[in-house]
Amino acid sequence: MDDDQQFCLRWNNHQSTLISVFDTLLENETLVDCTLAAEGKFLKAHKVVLSACSPYFATLLQEQYDKHPIFILKDVKYQELRAMMDYMYRGEVNISQDQLAALLKAAESLQIKGLSDNRTGGGVAPKPESSGHHRGGKLSGAYTLEQTKRARLATGGAMDTSGDVSGSREGSSSPSRRRRKVRRRSMENDAHDNSNSSVLQAAASNQSILQQTGAGLAVSALVTTQLSSGPAAGTSSQASSTQQQQPLTSTNVTKKTESAKLTSSTAAPASGASASAAVQQAHLHQQQAQTTSDAINTENVQAQSQGGAQGVQGDDEDIDEGSAVGGPNSATGPNPASASASAVHAGVVVKQLASVVDKSSSNHKHKIKDNSVSSVGSEMVIEPKAEYDDDAHDENVEDLTLDEEDMTMEELDQTAGTSQGGEGSSQTYATWQHDRSQDELGLMAQDAQQRDPQASKQDKGEQTEGAQDEFELDDCLLESNDIVITQNKDGFVLHVKKLGNITAAKLEENQAVAQQQGQAAVTVTGPAGQPTPTITELLNAAAASHSEPKPTLTTLTSTPIKLPSSECELINIKKIIPATTTIATHHPHTSSTIIHPHHIIQHVSQEPHHQEHHQQHQTIHIEEVPQTSQQHHQQQHHHQLQTVQPTHTQVQSIITAHPGQTINLVGLRNVQLADSKPIASRIRYSRGKIIGPTVQNLQIVETHEPIQHQHHELSDGTKYEISEIDLNNPNASAAIISDLVKYAEIDDIELPDGTKIGIGFAPSEITEHMQTSGGETHITTIEHEPQELQTVHQHEQTQQTHHIHAGQLQTHHIQTVVQSSSGQQQHDQQQHHQHHSIELQDDDGVETITPEELGMHDSSKSYTILTTRPMKEESEHDPSGMTYELSLSDSSLGPCDDPESRYVCRHCGKKYRWKSTLRRHENVECGGKEPCHPCPYCSYKAKQRGNLGVHVRKHHPEKPQLESKRGRKV
């Protein structure tokens, strides 16, 4: 008796263990003996798994006697192949609805069990014999699409159990909790799942009852559309808006093959289905943009296309209790609450594309059953991978296997979510990012259009009554003969008195240009954007203003202009030869080069920079010439150098002129002629920018004599008329600000806490630069083609090329110093001439930066003027003074903004809140103290060693930092 007794040793976890072993072997590429190739990419696999999961592979591998054959799948995409591999090895895969039809078609061609017909006798799909499936013998062959409620809506910790369903595996819509945990452990480091969120992981051969709940909630394409209750019974369209609850209808049990082929064509014949189908279809199209899903069954896709209801399984428990276990009497699905909850849960964004629907319908045969559209042992539900719940947390799982043929840019926007990496992630996510930035660009343009002109008008309206000399001298920070800088609650105010006689006509002209700027500054189009009629009209108006009052000023071109980015300001320099010279109106091709950072084609519809070489009066008549030849109208010493890589980090943009010349600086922002090439990329300035047009007649007289301190008398007739200052544009700001400080004798501006405002340009650097140029007329302009830089530079001795590195932002952070009351200015040339580059954090994101958001190198306390716009607009007939508001970029101006800042420096007039701070300022910084801390990497000198450390950190981040006296780096 005892000898005949036998014990049955049952390995309860045999299947899951075996599956995890194969999965691990695949991850480590251990014992792989065949290779599958698609689209030039390779996936290694095991013959035994392929043979077990596909009769096609089994037959193919039996005929191969190679040790390691390579199968090249011609019509299968790599993402589809990868999804099928995951499906075969793990029994389930997550796939987007857009890719579902293509995947099923490929799986059908490869005869993957559970994903294709694979009909054997009686329409029963063969069971997977190998470890490629979770529920080997228990479940029958149709694939299931499981859907789980994303517990992240309620609690983040519930994600682990979101896909887990307790209970027996028979009749359950999802694997048991124990088996799911095993699979999760085995796949924690799975490269396929972690790198590809669109891997189809529907528990394949273990599928059971496909129940189509009528939850036609199109918002959540989590269509576990239970085809319960044959469509004749109403197809249970449980749209979220209608929230109609389908009654429990007896679903006739059909063959599982038919469950695998259930389409909404089942719903078509039934008269009762038509009404609910129409409702579902309406909701489908209405909420199409918001459809988020973890995965979608092909049948569900077809169902939704032909009016079938999209079901939202809010919970696995809902699926089990309400629909799955019931068999023929399955419930119609989750209640509307769970449906709506699922609708908004974070999942793969899937668009209900009719094309995809049609494709899926055409790729699969439809079984039309009047009242019986449910299958016996297989339930088609979509189950999100628990790994994604664990890993993605609050972020959406992004479908990275978007069928590019079916996807448009808008759809890519909709499907964009958290990228899980993988093969398709780079293209899809990059495209979405690109479009998103385009949208943000447009929104910013609209916001700017609403904000800037209104702000300018408000400022003008409020300040028009004020007279020229009514400056707030109580808060005066700096005062010279011609420029007074005061401070208000918003920032610093620059009051500029007229230098020289300027006619009211020119004032009107500048106002017209200002209006144009105010509009152009906030009008943004994309790289291929079309110009707006507003700009064209303003250009025409500006042209009329140019031509009417002054015959020497030619009309602006009326061709449309494109503004690639609202962040990019520029300075256009227009030189006008005095009275006897007439400059012809320019053809659109004739556009002057302008100063501007890289990648923006800057063709400004202004007169080009005409150079006069050793001659005080030279009449230049410019006919219509093509753009490429416009440099020939400049001096021969202008060498056009096309550079891509920088060889010199210094950009010199000091503009000097001989006597008798008038240079009008008219700011046009990002002007590009209509016939120019499209913009290659956008630039986001990572630092502050000028927002409003500063249009009024600010004139600065310049001579080319290398005198240490230039005065603002009209010694040589050279005049500058500045319409807009761009401090983010290194070339423009260098030229304009240097002239501002040089010729108006502005004492350097310094904040109360000893920090500097980047505005001052010392005369020494300008004269030194002029000496290097031999006293010639020297204009450095840079015209940017999409991928190259053209540096036009005139130099007497050598061809000195100054580049702006493409991909870097040249920004001025001028560490100004406060001198004695004599008004002498000491500053180093390098600080002003060398524009230290700052890497762009995000090269193609464009965003409007406000002073509150912008911390301008907080450690260095170096401020860049963000906004200059006229506060006081003087009378048109009295263009003798102008007031500019200089808003600074850092919010740490608090001490200066505080009304209690009552301690004033006797040397520079700065106010300090604390007397100790004023004392430190006077002892260390002010009172004629000379800079004594030279920078080891440039010619900059600082008054304090701490400022030198700030300078090195800011402008030489790649160089070794200074060692502090305390033994730590500053």
UniProtKB/Swiss-Prot annotation:
Biased region (Low complexity) positions are 162-175, 228-251, 263-293, 329-340, 819-828
BTB domain: which residues? 32-97
Its taxonomic placement starts with:
Eukaryota, Metazoa, Ecdysozoa, Arthropoda, Hexapoda
Output this protein's name: Longitudinals lacking protein, isoforms F/I/K/T
ZnF bounds (C2H2-type): 903-925, 933-955
Provide any one GO MF term from the record: DNA binding
InterPro entries documented for this protein:
BTB/POZ_dom, Dros_DevTransReg, SKP1/BTB/POZ_sf, Znf_C2H2_sf, Znf_C2H2_type
> Which parts of this chain are annotated as the region Disordered?
115-200, 228-340, 447-468, 790-843
Tissue distribution is: By stage 11, isoform F is expressed throughout the mesoderm whereas isoform T, and at low levels isoform I, is expressed throughout the ectoderm. Isoform K is expressed in both mesoderm and ectoderm. Expression becomes restricted during later stages; starting from stage 14 to 15, isoform F is expressed in the gut. Isoform I is expressed in the CNS. Isoform I and isoform F show expression in the epithelium starting at stage 14, though for isoform I the CNS expression remains predominant.
Q: Which organism is it from?
A: Drosophila melanogaster (Fruit fly)
The record, for CDD domains, names: BTB_POZ_BAB-like
